[in-house]
């Protein structure tokens, strides 16, 4: 398993080192950098010797001397410069730097040099988890152990692969975000970094998407710097981008508020929240997202429940109910999702009584017809109790599929209990 270190908040105390000025020619320049040794936790600050192996319009590429030619090559360096400066899978005329800065904003420019330092160095593993790259926030401070410059670190194993170029885009958003909001909640920062990968054309975290779609009960919202579902973050931020557009994304990054409040405040500053009544909110968009993950059809509701910027490998896992009456006692995390699917035969009537322990309990009922997707209907029920009735209109259109998506619209420390009782009349 590979993991990204993006926004760690460790307190590091270490003796500083003299910093050399940035290179100004394409000739190799030697210097020392502070970096993290991540093969133990919390990570330790260590110093490595590196040589500049390439200079682009927006970056310097340094390679740890012990990794040069084993395994890092000049071809790797050249490809990284090409991707960062000039060309990405999303746009052959735009590099990672241009796409990211247009979408999210400018990097901090800690040292007064607009170029970004890229350090390629073997990162290794910790307890079976391989590290791919990180933005080391300490470099944006004047503390001991800081390089005092804008720098990203990428693992030395195949550093110019599409996967690691995606990591570079991901970590670059973290660097940009530091300039605007150093206190942002981790799940928001990770969501925007995953979006940066998608905007640059690196859908290389698809395995995280697949994991989430198999386990959608993993919460999107992890307050503070709690455990993050990268799959949920990627799918959420991309859906928000497709719904609200690039202008909103820029406001979201620059909004000084954090978490859900910051999201809602950002909407108020953009066209996304102007002239629309009621204006969208985090919770209303989350409800639509629950439906979009299942439907993902541009032909339904004028594309309200569909992705434009990516394709889903498959739909979310659903628990199927095939016999009646049926009862389900379960739990769902705040901003996690459970999907329960019922088959409604022709001329059938499905009744569902729902009750839960939280007033934030939300149920989205999705009615679909396999023969005619235009007949898809969505209804919403919120509160501790709900009585849901789905009538198949006398069976005119044949069998109907009914999916109940359940969540709690509040962050919770523990999952919330709910109960569903379903009956079928024919």
Language-model features, listed with the residues they occupy:
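Acidic/polar low-complexity interaction segments
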Residues: 27-74
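Juxtacatalytic substrate-recognition/specificity segment
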Residues: 57-185, 192, 202-206, 214-222
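Beta/coil-rich, acidic/histidine-enriched accessory regions frequently appended to metallopeptidases
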Residues: 23-25, 259-426
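Generic detector of solvent-exposed, compositionally biased contiguous segments
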Residues: 27-46, 93-98, 198-226, 325-333, ...
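Acidic/His/Gly-enriched intrinsically disordered linker/tail segments
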Residues: 140-147, 162, 166, 181-243, ...
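Bacterial N-terminal signal peptides
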Residues: 6-14
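Short, low-complexity intrinsically disordered segments enriched in A/P/G/S/L with frequent Arg
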Residues: 17, 21-22
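Positively charged n-region of N-terminal signal peptides that target proteins for export
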Residues: 1-4
């Amino acid at each position: 398993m590979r993991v990204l270190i993006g926004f760690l908040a460790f307190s590091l105390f270490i003796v500083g080192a003299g910093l050399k000025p940035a290179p100004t020619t394409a000739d190799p320049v030697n210097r020392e950098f502070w970096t993290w040794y991540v093969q133990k936790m919390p990570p330790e600050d260590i110093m490595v010797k590196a040589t500049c192996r390439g200079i682009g319009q927006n970056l310097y590429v340094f390679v740890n001397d012990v990794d040069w030619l084993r395994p890092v090559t000049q071809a790797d360096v050249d490809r990284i410069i090409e991707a960062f400066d000039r060309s990405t899978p999303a746009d052959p005329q735009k590099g990672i730097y241009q796409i990211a800065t247009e979408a999210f904003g400018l990097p901090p420019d800690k040292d007064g040099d607009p170029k970004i330092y890229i350090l390629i160095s073997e990162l290794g593993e910790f307890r079976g988890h391989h590290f791919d790259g990180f933005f080391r926030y300490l470099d944006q401070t004047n503390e001991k152990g800081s390089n005092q410059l804008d720098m990203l670190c990428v693992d030395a194993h195949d550093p110019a692969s599409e996967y690691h170029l995606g990591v570079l885009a991901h970590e670059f958003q973290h660097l940009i975000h530091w300039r605007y909001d150093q206190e942002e909640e981790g799940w928001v920062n990770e969501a925007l970094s995953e979006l940066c990968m998608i905007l640059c054309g690196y859908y290389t975290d698809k395995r995280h998407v697949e994991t989430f779609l198999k386990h959608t009960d993993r919460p999107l919202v992890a307050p503070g710097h709690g455990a993050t579902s990268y799959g949920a973050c990627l799918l959420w931020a991309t859906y928000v981008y497709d719904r609200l557009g690039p202008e909103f994304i820029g406001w979201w990054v620059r909004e000084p508020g954090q978490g859900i409040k910051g999201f809602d405040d950002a909407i108020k500053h953009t066209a996304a929240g102007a002239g629309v009544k009621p204006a969208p909110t985090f919770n209303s968009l989350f409800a639509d997202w629950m439906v979009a993950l299942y439907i993902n059809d541009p032909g339904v509701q004028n594309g309200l429940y569909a992705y434009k910027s990516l394709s889903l490998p498959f739909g979310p896992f659903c628990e199927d109910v095939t016999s009646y009456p049926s009862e389900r006692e379960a739990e769902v995390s705040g901003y996690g999702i459970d999907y329960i699917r019922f088959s409604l035969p022709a001329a059938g009537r499905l009744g569902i009584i729902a009750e839960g322990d939280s007033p934030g309990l939300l149920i989205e009922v999705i009615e679909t017809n396999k023969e005619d997707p235009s007949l898809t209907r969505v209804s919403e029920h919120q509160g501790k109790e709900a009585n849901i009735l789905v009538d198949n209109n006398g069976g005119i259109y044949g069998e109907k599929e009914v999916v109940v998506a359940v969540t709690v619209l509040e962050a919770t420390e523990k999952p919330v209990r709910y109960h569903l009782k379903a009956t079928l009349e024919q």
